[in-house]
Curated annotation (Swiss-Prot):
It is found in: Nucleus. Belongs to the SLX1 family. It comes from Scheffersomyces stipitis (strain ATCC 58785 / CBS 6054 / NBRC 10063 / NRRL Y-11545). SUPFAM superfamilies: GIY-YIG endonuclease. The gene is SLX1. It comes from the Eukaryota. This is Structure-specific endonuclease subunit SLX1.
Length: 336
């Protein structure tokens, strides 16, 4: 039977990737049944936990709705994924630690689908994934909300937990949106978004409203699309982006610098510095102008957000193009 012609399905919808402000993979534990765990991913952990516990009617997951398992508590969140796709890759690997390609067979502590049900196993598997050849190149961090989980990392029963970027905190305090007299250097949900809003305002002023040149190649930067034709297909958008008519542009977010760069120019400089060549930039680099420390993830976030800001109206892109939904339902609950 011949294939039916495309009717503009979701897979054909043009979508621009934007590095999310927050995307994490979380581990839940049932309070009535402590040996039952659930693994999922979300851009909004407080909202997601309320869905799992039935406080919100919409959302949640079938497996966490079963009688006798609620309430659930969130034990940890692995976060700072550069995309929803990379978060789902980590989530799937976390759910299938006994067979994932991201943990070497000789290093696996979960030997089959039914093994690895203790908290020590969960913590050790997180650490194994974080040091894998793929995920270690992402600047991933771990939030821990329970003392027992933190102690498990510290005890390091399976000798896997070295070099984990760990923050031991309180779930409600970290994700609080209430005004608090917090030190601006404290890592929290509120200060994180406040800092990002300030950086975004600087970026728009420097790149969109100004007439900058790349501080490396000295070429002028024009953030104006060369076409106003609406784009209705993903393939059309890909062809437009590959034409390099609107390159990714970023900015040093040191307020005393604010120099503008092509992301490709920075990437080339960061991967060919000090006579050493690497495949990808380090997670933290130095500004070529002011020598301030810059996170590559933040530079990429600025660049993708600027591109979306410029293109979304000019090319009449659909409004829902960001990777920020959490409708994916995990299929992994370990029951006692």
């Amino acid at each position: 039977m011949p294939r039916r012609p495309s009717t503009g399905t979701q897979s054909d919808t043009p979508a621009l990737h934007v590095v999310p402000s927050f995307y994490g993979v979380y581990l839940l534990q049932s309070e009535p049944k402590p040996s039952s765990f659930y693994i999922g991913s979300t851009p909004d952990p407080p909202r997601r936990l309320r869905q799992h516990n039935g406080d919100l009617k919409a959302g949640g997951a079938y497996r966490t709705k079963r009688a006798g398992f609620r309430p659930w508590r969130m034990l940890l969140v692995v976060y700072d994924f550069p995309s929803k796709v990379s978060a789902l890759q980590f989530e799937h690997s976390f759910q299938h630690c006994h067979e994932t390609r991201h943990i070497k067979q000789e290093e696996r502590i979960s030997k089959n689908k039914l093994s690895g049900r203790t908290l020590h196993h969960k913590v050790a598997n997180v650490a194994l994934l974080l040091r894998s050849s793929y995920f270690r190149h992402l600047p991933l961090k771990v939030l821990v909300f329970e003392e027992a989980v933190y102690n498990s990392f510290m005890n390091n029963k399976f000798v896997t937990c070295s070099h984990v970027d760990l923050l031991n905190t309180n779930f409600n305090e970290y994700f609080s949106v209430m005004e608090k007299d917090l030190d601006s250097t404290v890592d929290s949900w509120k200060t994180r978004h406040t800092n990002e809003n300030e950086i975004w305002s600087m970026a728009k002023e420097a790149v969109i409203l100004g007439s900058p040149r790349c501080a490396l190649c000295l070429e002028p930067i024009e953030q104006v699309p060369e076409t106003s034709s609406p784009i209705s297909k993903r393939s059309d958008l890909q062809r437009y982006l590959q034409s390099e008519s609107l390159p990714l542009v970023t900015m040093c977010y040191n307020p005393q610098c604010r120099d503008v760069f092509h992301l490709s120019c920075l990437g080339h400089r960061f991967t060919n510095s000090d006579g050493f060549q690497s495949l990808i930039p380090a997670t933290v680099n130095r500004c070529c102008s002011c020598n301030a420390k810059l996170e590559w993830r933040t530079l990429a976030k600025i660049a993708t957000k600027l591109r979306y800001y410029v293109l979304k109206d000019s090319l009449q892109l659909p409004s829902q193009v960001l990777e920020n939904d959490d409708n994916y339902e995990s299929q992994n609950v370990n029951d006692s």
